[in-house]
């Protein structure tokens, strides 16, 4: 038997996450207060013959190992999904908020807004929980 559930949550920076740097633009040195597009995190959960799989897509430029590892371990603990069955990808947008703790362009300044990475983890957990709690 195959069971499938999906959920989408908003991850657009607001409130304490603005202003923020825009990701993937090394020549842009200023922060922005404006949001041109809404950003989302979409999760799909499969249960195929009692085997659980979680696939996530996040509207950010990229996800580093540390952030993905935190998300995967959280879902593993919450729902007993095998770590290797949790896949997280990104759309690689250059118009979203900065999410990396280490600057990809070799600059000294870390440009991610404090707390935004933790916000992403919570929103990923929320989307996964919505999938598991649907009837």
Where in the sequence are the language-model features?
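Conserved beta-alpha junction segments in alpha/beta enzyme cores
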Residues: 1-89, 93-135
């Amino acid at each position: 038997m195959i069971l499938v559930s999906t959920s989408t949550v908003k991850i657009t920076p607001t409130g304490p996450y603005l202003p923020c740097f825009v990701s993937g633009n090394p020549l842009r040195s200023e922060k922005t207060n404006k949001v041109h597009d809404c950003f989302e995190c979409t999760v799909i959960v499969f249960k195929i013959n009692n085997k659980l799989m979680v696939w996530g897509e996040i509207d950010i430029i990229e996800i580093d190992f540390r952030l993905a590892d935190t998300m995967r371990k959280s879902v593993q603990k919450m729902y007993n999904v095998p770590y290797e069955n949790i896949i997280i990808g990104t759309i690689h947008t250059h118009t979203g908020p900065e999410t990396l703790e280490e600057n990809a362009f070799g600059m000294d300044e870390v440009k991610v807004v404090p707390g935004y990475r933790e916000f992403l983890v919570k929103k990923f957990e929320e989307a996964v929980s919505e999938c598991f709690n649907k009837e």
